[in-house]
Regions:
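Bacterial N-terminal signal peptides that target proteins for export
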Residues: 3-21
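A short, amphipathic edge element
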Residues: 63-64, 128-140, 190
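Short, exposed beta-strand/loop patches in secreted or surface proteins that constitute
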Residues: 45, 68-72, 95-97, 137-142, ...
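An acidic-aromatic
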Residues: 68-127, 183-194
Length: 224
């Protein structure tokens, strides 16, 4: 969970109105550098895909499991949440992650509003088979993810602080596509099912016309 302070312009007042925007996000907890720095330093950065595709997304983090439809185009992706994300401002049915803009957009259709959040590593998904900071890879053998045959690997990565993390990684051997990544050291995994490699339209990754854009800044979760 993240608390986000939202600044809304109130035409009846000279002072901005403050809201607490509570959203359940993809908290990956990778401890990587700021996004711009990480992208510049890494050969296999999270959040950037070498090809365009759509897939059914399943992820689990901090005991929470969620499902969505995912659309990916290079340095941007669209997540259509099953059931939506409950926030203090209503339900966000869609999240758009834009690495080029360094922004994440929550789309609240009922309010015709887009909440814009600064991009952090919390929002990045892995798309490449070779992982950022990978130091070793061991083939375990044949496996299955959903209805797809897969090769299962054990992969060890090291972050910039020298801390290591072990993953199990399932790869589609025919298309060399990442199907599932599961941490052995924490309660986290991400899975891509029914992956269709195809061109994705640009408008999937833009904010809807006529929607109000408001900005949010991260704040500490209140104690108690």
């Amino acid at each position: 969970m993240k608390w986000l302070t939202v600044f809304l312009n109130n035409p009846q007042s000279h002072k901005p109105t403050y809201w607490c925007f509570l959203a359940c996000v993809l908290v990956l907890g990778l401890g990587v550098p700021p996004v711009k720095e990480a992208l510049a330093q890494s050969e296999n950065p999270w959040g950037i895909s070498p090809f365009e595709f759509s897939a059914r997304l399943i992820w689990k983090t901090e005991g929470r499991k969620a499902k969505a439809q995912l659309f990916v185009k290079s340095d941007r992706y669209r997540i259509e949440h099953l059931g939506g994300i409950r926030t203090e401002l209503g339900y966000a049915g869609v999240t758009i992650v834009r690495l080029d803009e360094q922004k994440v957009w929550y789309i609240l259709s009922e309010r015709r509003t887009v909440v814009s959040v600064p991009l952090t590593s919390d929002y990045l998904l892995p798309f490449t088979v070779r992982l950022e900071g990978e130091t070793s890879r061991t083939l375990i053998g044949d496996s299955v993810v959903g209805d797809r045959s897969a090769m299962l690997y054990e992969v060890v990565v090291e972050d910039r602080f020298g801390q290591t993390e072990r993953f199990f990684e399932w790869v589609d051997p025919d298309r060399n596509i990442l199907l599932k990544l599961l941490s052995q050291d924490r309660d986290w995994f991400v899975e891509y099912g029914h992956v269709v490699v195809s061109s994705q339209p640009d408008y999937y990754f833009e904010t809807p016309l006529g929607y109000r854009m408001i900005e949010a800044q991260e704040a500490q979760i209140p104690k108690g």
